[in-house]
Amino acid sequence: MLPAAMKGLGLALLAVLLCSAPAHGLWCQDCTLTTNSSHCTPKQCQPSDTVCASVRITDPSSSRKDHSVNKMCASSCDFVKRHFFSDYLMGFINSGILKVDVDCYEKDLCNGVAGAGHSPWALAGGLLLSLGPALLWAGP
C-alpha cells in the first residue's frame, strides 16, 4: 500500500486539476485576407475573447468565385459582424459586389481545419484520471 501522505498528495493533485480553471484562454486560427486556410496559424486569444470567428468574403460575380478568408479571436460574434458589415462594406454587399459569411465557434481551433488541435488540459486530465486510481490504490 502507498503511504497515507502519498495518497493525500495524489488526491490533492487530482482536486487541483479538476477544480482549477485552465491557465490559457481560447485558441483560434488566425489569418487575414488569405485565399488558403492552410496559411492560418493557431493563436492564443485574449482572456476577453469568447469566440473564434471565420469570415469568408466572396465575389459572387466572379466566374472563379474569388474569395478571401479572415480568421480571428473575437469578444463576440456580434462584434465581428458589426466590423465586417460596416457602413463602408454594406454598399458593396447590398449592390451584390460582395458576399460576406460570418461563422463563430466557442471551442479551441474550431474555426480552422478539423482536428487542428486539442487542449493540453484535456490530455493532462485524461492522463491523471486514468492513472489516479492506480496511484491511489496500488499495492506494494
Curated annotation (Swiss-Prot):
* Pro-piece positions: 116-140
Glycosylation sites recorded in the entry for this protein: 36
Q: Where in the cell is it found?
A: Cell membrane
What does UniProt give as the signal peptide span?
1-25
Q: Specify whether Chloroplast is a keyword of the entry.
A: no
Q: Which GO terms describe its biological process?
A: acetylcholine receptor signaling pathway
Q: SUPFAM superfamilies from the entry?
A: Snake toxin-like (SSF57302)
Which InterPro entries does this entry report, sorted A to Z? LY6_UPA_recep-like, LY6H/LY6L_nAChR_modulators, Snake_toxin-like_sf
Q: Which cysteines are joined by disulfide bonds?
A: 28-52, 31-40, 45-73, 77-104
GO CC terms of this entry? plasma membrane; side of membrane; synapse
Q: Which PANTHER family does this chain map to?
A: LYMPHOCYTE ANTIGEN 6H
Q: What does this protein do?
A: Believed to act as a modulator of nicotinic acetylcholine receptors (nAChRs) activity. In vitro inhibits alpha-3:beta-4-containing nAChRs maximum response. May play a role in the intracellular trafficking of alpha-7-containing nAChRs and may inhibit their expression at the cell surface. Seems to inhibit alpha-7/CHRNA7 signaling in hippocampal neurons.
Q: What is this protein called?
A: Lymphocyte antigen 6H
